[in-house]
């Protein structure tokens, strides 16, 4: 059987979502580890006044591509940028470009999607379902297409506790839903959204499930496969440890915790935090396309790309490693010392929100007003709470994913391919990974230099001293207000102090007797 790099040799690849987190990493890995790939066509839309070419130039000039740039200085020559809008008819492609793609493309990686949990149903359907349908329509016309790879999510069927590697029947016919959305106004769509998504937490998971069904039905005559990653996090090893470039998902929460802004969060300490490094997902995606291209399985292949079943990690452990990392290597200009309390209790959660989030933010904004600056902390806290609401469903529950196809795929790889395209999460050491992840948010998201660590540590010590001073003043005030004015309170106080003294005396005496 040919190796993975040999399979991609001379192939023309079509990639959507190249400007997204996973798409960037896939583009870099494909060009670096399969250097004889013929060309990678990337479908990109203009955005914020930038042309597609300018967007790709900016991406390929970032640190993520440093290793590739060193190994293959001319790699950009293989990237062919195509202006496209996936939600428009015919993908908004000109006829000559469309004919070129139909003639030459061998492999499609469909990574494009909206990952916003608060997307309206109309937009989520357009970006996740309609775009997939239209890309499949183009794929069906391609004369040399070997594989269509669709990137989904492990939470597409989060309304089930046990999720197999199959495409489940959809809650509604995607075609009928798309037809209905054409004549509904936004108000009506928003009104029916809760009933449509049912027991799913958001439109993202709902539309990703619909997109899988579209792939199964529309791609019935194609050689298709689906990858379902769970919570995609920073890179494990490639192109270097800790690469992350966005605030999405847990990354934003890690930063908020490191800054001392996030103090409490609704989560189950025992729930599995099914994080999966982005390079694991990319390696598995490239390997899955190789397997389908070489073996041409009779049925659609579905791969649950998760870690919880083979190398479980829990939210309590996430909290511990994030806080310990940021205490050793603090972020610059932290608001408070890092400390997070996870709770699944509704009343405790709202108590800590009021005491640890809103009260300090309110007082800090008063301080900013007094000093003539614009208040900002309450706005930050409000945004943080919105993000927490969207994530608490995933931090409070656990799922069981079947990963037999993932194991099968791993066993099909040659020893060399297992090294180059490693997705064996049993080898993942969580403590090391979490430290690299946190440091990645510091270096690549916040763009903080490691040379600033001494000043950041000094600032954290200053915050500690302020806290100790504040607590001391608080104790003195409580003493003056409550204890010093009440005979009963003084008697209770003296009793507690006497009891503690007797206990310590007994403990010292017992220790002396042992020796």
Swiss-Prot record:
Main subcellular localisation: membrane
UniProt keywords, alphabetically: Lipid biosynthesis, Lipid metabolism, Membrane, NADP, Oxidoreductase, Peroxisome, Transmembrane, Transmembrane helix
A GO BP entry: ether lipid biosynthetic process
Transmembrane segments: 466-483
InterPro entries recorded: FAR, FAR_C, Far_NAD-bd, NAD(P)-bd_dom_sf
Membrane topology listed for this record: Single-pass membrane protein
Coiled coil: none
Catalyzed reaction equations: a long-chain fatty acyl-CoA + 2 NADPH + 2 H(+) = a long-chain primary fatty alcohol + 2 NADP(+) + CoA; hexadecanoyl-CoA + 2 NADPH + 2 H(+) = hexadecan-1-ol + 2 NADP(+) + CoA; octadecanoyl-CoA + 2 NADPH + 2 H(+) = octadecan-1-ol + 2 NADP(+) + CoA; (9Z)-octadecenoyl-CoA + 2 NADPH + 2 H(+) = (9Z)-octadecen-1-ol + 2 NADP(+) + CoA
Membership in a protein family: Belongs to the fatty acyl-CoA reductase family.
Task performed by this protein: Catalyzes the reduction of saturated and unsaturated C16 or C18 fatty acyl-CoA to fatty alcohols. It plays an essential role in the production of ether lipids/plasmalogens which synthesis requires fatty alcohols. In parallel, it is also required for wax monoesters production since fatty alcohols also constitute a substrate for their synthesis.
UniProt-recorded name of the protein: Fatty acyl-CoA reductase 1
Organism: Gallus gallus (Chicken)
């Amino acid at each position: 059987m040919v190796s993975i790099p040999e399979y991609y040799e001379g192939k023309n690849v079509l990639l959507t979502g190249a400007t997204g987190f996973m798409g960037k990493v896939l583009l870099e890995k494909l060009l670096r580890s399969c250097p004889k790939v013929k060309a990678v066509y990337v479908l990109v839309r203009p955005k914020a006044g930038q042309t597609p070419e300018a967007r790709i130039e900016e991406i390929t000039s970032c640190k993520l591509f440093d290793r590739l740039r060193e190994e293959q200085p001319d790699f950009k020559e293989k990237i062919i940028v195509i202006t496209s809008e996936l939600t428009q008819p015919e993908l908004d492609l000109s006829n000559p470009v469309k004919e070129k793609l139909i003639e030459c493309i061998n492999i499609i990686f469909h990574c494009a999607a909206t990952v916003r949990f608060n997307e309206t149903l109309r937009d989520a359907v357009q970006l996740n379902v309609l775009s997939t349908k239209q890309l499949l329509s183009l794929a069906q016309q391609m004369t040399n297409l070997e594989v269509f790879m669709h990137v989904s999510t492990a939470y597409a069927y989060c309304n089930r506790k046990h999720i197999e590697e199959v495409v489940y029947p959809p809650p509604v016919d995607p075609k009928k839903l798309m037809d209905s959305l054409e004549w509904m106004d936004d108000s009506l769509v928003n009104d029916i959204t809760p009933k449509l998504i049912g027991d799913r937490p958001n439109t993202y998971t709902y539309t990703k499930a619909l997109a899988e069904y579209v792939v199964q039905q529309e791609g019935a005559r194609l050689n298709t496969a689906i990858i379902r990653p769970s919570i995609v996090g920073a890179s494990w090893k490639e192109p270097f440890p800790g690469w992350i470039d966005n605030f999405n998902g847990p990354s934003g929460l890690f930063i908020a915790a490191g800054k001392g802004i996030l103090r409490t969060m609704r989560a189950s300490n025992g729930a599995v935090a099914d994080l999966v490094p982005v390079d694991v997902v990319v390696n598995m995606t490239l390997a899955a396309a190789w397997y389908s291209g070489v073996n041409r399985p009779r049925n659609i292949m579905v791969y649950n790309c998760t870690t919880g079943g083979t190398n479980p990690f829990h939210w309590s452990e996430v909290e511990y490693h994030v806080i310990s990392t940021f205490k050793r290597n603090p972020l610059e200009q932290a608001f408070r010392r890092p400390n997070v309390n996870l709770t699944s209790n509704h009343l405790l959660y709202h108590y800590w929100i009021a005491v640890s989030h809103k009260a300090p933010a309110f007082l800090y904004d008063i301080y900013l007003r007094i000093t003539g600056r614009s208040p900002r902390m309450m706005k930050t806290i409000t945004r943080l709470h919105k993000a927490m609401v969207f994530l608490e469903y995933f931090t409070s529950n656990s799922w069981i994913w079947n990963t037999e196809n993932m194991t099968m795929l791993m066993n099909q790889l040659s020893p060399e391919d297992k090294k180059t395209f490693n997705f064996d999460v049993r080898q993942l050491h969580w403590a090391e990974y979490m430290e690299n992840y946190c440091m990645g948010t510091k270096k690549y998201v916040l763009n903080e230099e490691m040379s600033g660590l001494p000043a950041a540590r000094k600032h954290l010590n200053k915050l500690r001293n302020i806290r100790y001073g504040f607590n001391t003043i608080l104790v003195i005030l409580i003493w003056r207000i409550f204890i010093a004015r009440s005979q009963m309170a003084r008697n209770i106080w003296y009793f507690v102090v006497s009891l503690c003294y007797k206990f310590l005396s007994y403990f010292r005496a017992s220790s002396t007797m042992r020796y």
